[in-house]
Regions:
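Iron-sulfur (Fe-S) cluster-binding segments and ferredoxin-like electron-carrier domains
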Residues: 54-65, 77-95
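Flexible, acidic/Gly-rich N-terminal and inter-domain linker regions that tether
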Residues: 1-73
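Catalytic cores of large soluble enzymes that bind and process phosphate-bearing ligands
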Residues: 20, 24, 88, 121
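Conserved AdoMet/S-adenosylmethionine-binding subsite of the radical SAM
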Residues: 93-102, 106-108, 112-185
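Fold-independent oxyanion-binding glycine-rich loops
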Residues: 53, 67-69, 81, 113, ...
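Generic secondary-structure signature for well-ordered alpha-helical cores
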Residues: 37, 41, 55, 80, ...
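Acidic/polar active-site rim loop that often engages polyanionic ligands
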Residues: 12-15, 78-81, 113, 138
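Residues that scaffold the ATP/ADP-binding catalytic core of kinase and kinase-like folds
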Residues: 53, 74, 78, 177-180
Length: 185
């Protein structure tokens, strides 16, 4: 049995329901957008052009991306802008903590761009952000999704010493595909 398409039909091919995304219109979506804008934050949702942004923001959640929105690497699988980032913003950890408080989150997720231009790869900013969230939002679970810090264990220890509740790092692919897929990741 084959699949045949009626090329004479004027009816458009419709996507299946599970593939269609609704335009974001909920009050929660607007509220998250306003909080992100007011606190001058970046989200991986926006920077990586995530197709699920409308769904997540409509549920009142977003993944904050610290250390700016320009990555020092240019991974083939990622839509985040690459280049030479500007200086990191020392007020960012406090603004992230305030946004978590404003959103009333019981669990927050924070990620970042890779910052190979910084001596510690941004580990000290990670630690400051975790501590600021914890101080402003006691009881809020903190999940982090970090860059690899170029494999420098001391930089990783800086983040771990701040005691995030959940520590993540994406591998993206199997070992034999690391070089072709993740040349700089």
């Amino acid at each position: 049995m084959g699949f045949f398409m009626d090329t004479n039909s004027s009816a458009p091919n419709r996507k299946p329901d599970w593939l269609r995304a609704k335009l974001p219109s909920s009050p929660a979506y607007k509220e998250v957008r306003d909080i992100v804008d007011t606190h001058q934050l970046h989200t991986v949702c926006q920077s990586a052009q995530c197709p699920n942004m409308g769904e997540c923001w409509s549920r009142g959640t977003a993944t904050v991306m610290i250390l700016g929105n320009v990555c020092t690497r240019s991974c083939t699988f990622c839509a985040v802008q690459t280049g030479q980032p500007t200086e990191f913003d020392i007020g960012e950890p406090a603004r992230v903590a305030d946004a978590v408080h404003t959103m009333g989150l019981k669990h927050c997720v924070v990620t970042s761009v890779a910052r190979d231009d910084l001596k510690d790869g941004g580990a000290s900013v990670w630690a400051a952000t975790i501590r600021a969230i914890r101080h402003r939002n006691p009881g809020c679970g903190i999940e982090v999704l970090t860059a690899d810090f170029r494999g420098v264990a001391e930089h990783l220890d800086i983040v771990l010493d701040a005691e995030p509740d959940i520590f993540n790092h994406n591998l993206e692919t199997v070992e034999r595909l690391q070089r072709p897929i993740r040349r700089t990741a």
